[in-house]
Amino acid sequence: MPRILPVPLGTANTYIVSEGPASILIDAGFPRQGRKFFTTLSKQGMDPARISLIVITHVHYDHVGNLREIRDACRCPVAVPAGEADWLRRGAVVFPAGVHPVGRALIGAGRLLSRVLPGFVRF
């Protein structure tokens, strides 16, 4: 059974879904909250090195603000909805290299995410 760990960041939340040694981070919160994110993880006993994938549910400011800092620290790929990946690649939002559109490989994860974040995840 997956473990769901909320990572509260004030008015924005992120979540870590873990099963076995792998963990997926759902969303990255507001900008300039990287230190708070890593401090909160540490207090909850979570090693950020366990994060193997970051999934962005949608590219609103409060969901991608810390993405670069978290991704650089975790050194993992980022998945975004396919319909928003091209928009990001055109430079509308500064986004780290390694962003990949969400594809069929994540459909199973999408089913799990739709239970964790109902109303936001659409695959």
How should each PLM-predicted stretch be described?
Residues 1-44:
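Conserved beta-strand hairpin/beta-sheet module of binuclear metal-dependent hydrolase folds
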Residues 35-80, 84:
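Active-site metal-binding motif and surrounding structural segment of the metallo-beta-lactamase
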Residues 15, 24, 62, 85-86:
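Glycine-centered loop/turn positions within well-structured domains
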